[in-house]
Each structure stands twice: as structure tokens, then as C-alpha cells.
């Protein structure tokens, strides 16, 4: 029987993809509120379609934010700035329907179960309960310098490169909507061996030929982004394989906040708890605990305690402490996983208020995460990407190893 290749594929999308437009609007609104009211509670959902933006959700804040202005500014910065694109930040209709956060939810967050039952620890970080129940995953692996899986890392880099060529005017026929997909072949030790297939679909104007698009994407994008040792004569390049891609963005497909959760995380290489990130303040553990889980996993791998590490956290609404912590190194750990769980409990504060304080999350830093991934970013400084707990982990493990 012929031996099959070991292949894994991940995708990314550009900032002009309709779902990412929605994510960026939701996070731009969150940032605008946090800039004036760091304790604001935000759950903001956005839908975009031809000529229309709909913003709904629950927001409780002492700040005033001109949501329509934030929406228009975000759309224009992405690149939807003229009527022929079918979506134009200058003149699209914007409908806003915002309520306050449910008082029932607010009560559970503001006064945790531990506080209500007089079980809180000595500090005040027990007072804030999780904003919902749920399970969250974090992951890290030594496939790239930023400790991310190679397929999603390359897919994001391709999309950032396409966007920079468009915004710099070097390829003036590019339009904002685009997608990339990278298939990596792995060797028998599950290490990246080569790139099997690269797919790029990018929106263009009607004047450019398919041959010109293909040449530009291969020479100016793929070969500039993907290290040459991964490319060979058998690597397949599929450039705009559907043919014409002129109609795109919200004119081509409606977009919705929270529909690109695999693009946002690990490209399917690790598990996902199901909760989206964008438009949510940091009392929502869908977001903050996912960031914390990545922070934990990355520090474990950076400490040399495992080649790869997956963390699961789980919470109950209104309860400060996580109901479970799981560490899975897929057989690559240098110490027992029980010891790693113990180290995690002692080195990291995984209560919602503890996460917010540990990572300094009450800041307007989230719009920049809403395109090109929340993890493994080398172009922006994100606190959950820091590896400042490496020495604490090493010390704890060395002092408690049997």
C-alpha cells in the first residue's frame, strides 16, 4: 500500500473579509469604550452587508462613544472607501441597537459566588466572577519562533503581505477581500518537512489579468513570505482558482462577528472551546481565559518543559476560580503533566480578575487582534505572548519534581 503524506492545512483571511470587517468594528467599539472607561462592560455584535452595518449588543459604561464615527473610521481604514466596492465607509447606512448588560449577569460578575458565600481568598481578586460558563483552550508548539503551528503562521503572514502591498499602492489593482490557505507536509516525527499547497484568493479590480495576478502572488507574496527550504518543484500554487474575483467584501458575502474563530486561534491544529473573542470585554472568559491559556502554554513550551502544550480551562458563571485546569503535552513533556498542572495553579492567577491584572487587559488593544490572529503575533506587542513566567515555572518544577 502506498504511504500517504502527512498533511495539515490552515487558512487565514484578510482584514477586508466581511467576517473580519465585523470583528474589527466590534473590537474598535470595545477599544473606544475602554479608552474612556476601563471597567466598561461590552458585548458588541456586528453584521455587515452591501451598504449596511448593523451593530447590536449589551454595553454598560460611564463613557460616551460615537459608535457611528467609530464604525465609519474602521471601515475606511480597512480600505472600503469608494462606492464601486459596494461597501463604503463614507456613505453606508449604520443601524445601532444597544442595551445595557443584563442585571442578572452583572450581579454574578460583580459579586462572585465565593464572595456571596464568604469563601473568598485574602485578596480582592475573588470578588469578580466569570461572565459565563465555558471551556477555553490555549496552545503552543516549537514549530516557529513565536511557538505557533506552521500552517496558520504562514497563512497569516501571506495575508499581511497581501494587505501591505495593497495599502502601499505597489499592486494598485488589489481590493481588500482575500483568503489564504497553506498545506504543510510533516515527516514521520511530526516535524514540518515542506509546503505541499498554497492557495491565495484575492479580490482585484476588473482590469488585471489572471496571469498577472498569479505572477504577483507567487513572486511578491509567497516567495517573500515562505522560507525557500519549504518550497520545491512539487509545491502547488493555486491562485484565484475560481477565476474572476472582483465582487467581494460585504457586497459579495454578509459578515458577522465571531465567525472566524479557527482563523483567530490555531488554524485547527489545537482544540477550540467554541467562544468567539471580538466585541467582548475581559470579564468574558471566552476571551480573557483563552488569552491566559495561550500565555500558560507558551511559557511552558518556552521553558523547555514540553515540545508542545495544550491547556484547557473551564469556568462557571459567577464563580471566580476555574472549575478545571488540564495540561496535555501530547507525550512531549519532560516532567509529569500532574506536576505541570500543579505548577500552573501556583504560578498563574487564572481567576478572571487575576487574568485581567496579570496581563493588564483593561486597555484599548483589541482592534489590532481582530485581523491576522490573536496569537503568535510578531507585528504587535500583546501581553499574552510574553514569556516572563519561564523562570518561575522552571523553579517550581525543579523544586517539586520527585
From Swiss-Prot:
Binding site for Mg(2+): 19
Binding of L-methionine, residues: 58, 101, 253, 284
An example Gene Ontology CC term for this record: cytoplasm
EC number assigned by the record: 2.5.1.6
Domain of life: Bacteria
Role played: Catalyzes the formation of S-adenosylmethionine (AdoMet) from methionine and ATP. The overall synthetic reaction is composed of two sequential steps, AdoMet formation and the subsequent tripolyphosphate hydrolysis which occurs prior to release of AdoMet from the enzyme.
The protein, known as: S-adenosylmethionine synthase
Gene this protein is translated from: metK
Amino acid at each position: 500500500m502506498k504511504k500517504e503524506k502527512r498533511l495539515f492545512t490552515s487558512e487565514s483571511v484578510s482584514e477586508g473579509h466581511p467576517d473580519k470587517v465585523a470583528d474589527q468594528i466590534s473590537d474598535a467599539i470595545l477599544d473606544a469604550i475602554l479608552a474612556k472607561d476601563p471597567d466598561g462592560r461590552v458585548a458588541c455584535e456586528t453584521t455587515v452587508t452591501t451598504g449596511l452595518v448593523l451593530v447590536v449588543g449589551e454595553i454598560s459604561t460611564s463613557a460616551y462613544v460615537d459608535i457611528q464615527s467609530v464604525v465609519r473610521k474602521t471601515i475606511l481604514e480597512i480600505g472600503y472607501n469608494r462606492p464601486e466596492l459596494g461597501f463604503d465607509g463614507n456613505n453606508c447606512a449604520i443601524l445601532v441597537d444597544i442595551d445595557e448588560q443584563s442585571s442578572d449577569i452583572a450581579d454574578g460578575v460583580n459579586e462572585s459566588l465565593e464572595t456571596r458565600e464568604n469563601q473568598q481568598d485574602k485578596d480582592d481578586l475573588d470578588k469578580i466572577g466569570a461572565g459565563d460558563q465555558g471551556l477555553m483552550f490555549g496552545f503552543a508548539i516549537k514549530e516557529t519562533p513565536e511557538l505557533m503551528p506552521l500552517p496558520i503562521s504562514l497563512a497569516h503572514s501571506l495575508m499581511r503581505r497581501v494587505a501591505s502591498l495593497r495599502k502601499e499602492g505597489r499592486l494598485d489593482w488589489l481590493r481588500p477581500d482575500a483568503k489564504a490557505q497553506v498545506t504543510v507536509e510533516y515527516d514521520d516525527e511530526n516535524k514540518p518537512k515542506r509546503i505541499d499547497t498554497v492557495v491565495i484568493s484575492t479580490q482585484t479590480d476588473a482590469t488585471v489579468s489572471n496571469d498577472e495576478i498569479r505572477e504577483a502572488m507567487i513572486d511578491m507574496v509567497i516567495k517573500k513570505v515562505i522560507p525557500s527550504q519549504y518550497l520545491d518543484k512539487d509545491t502547488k500554487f493555486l491562485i484565484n482558482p475560481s477565476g474572476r474575483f472582483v465582487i467581494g467584501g460585504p457586497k459579495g458575502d454578509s459578515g458577522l462577528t465571531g465567525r472566524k474563530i479557527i482563523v483567530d486561534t490555531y488554524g485547527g491544529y489545537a482544540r477550540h472551546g467554541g467562544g468567539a473573542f471580538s466585541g467582548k470585554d475581559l470579564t468574558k472568559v471566552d476571551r480573557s481565559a483563552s488569552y491566559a491559556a495561550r500565555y500558560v502554554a507558551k511559557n511552558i513550551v518556552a521553558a523547555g518543559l514540553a515540545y508542545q502544550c495544550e491547556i484547557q480551562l473551564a469556568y462557571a458563571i459567577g464563580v471566580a476560580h476555574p472549575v478545571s485546569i488540564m495540561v496535555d503535552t501530547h507525550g512531549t513533556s519532560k516532567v509529569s503533566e500532574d506536576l505541570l498542572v500543579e505548577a500552573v495553579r501556583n504560578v498563574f492567577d487564572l481567576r478572571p480578575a487575576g487574568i485581567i491584572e496579570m496581563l493588564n487587559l483593561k486597555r484599548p488593544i483589541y482592534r489590532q487582534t481582530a485581523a491576522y490572529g490573536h496569537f503568535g503575533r510578531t507585528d504587535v506587542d500583546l501581553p499574552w505572548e510574553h514569556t516572563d513566567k519561564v523562570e518561575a515555572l522552571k523553579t517550581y518544577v525543579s523544586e517539586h519534581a520527585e
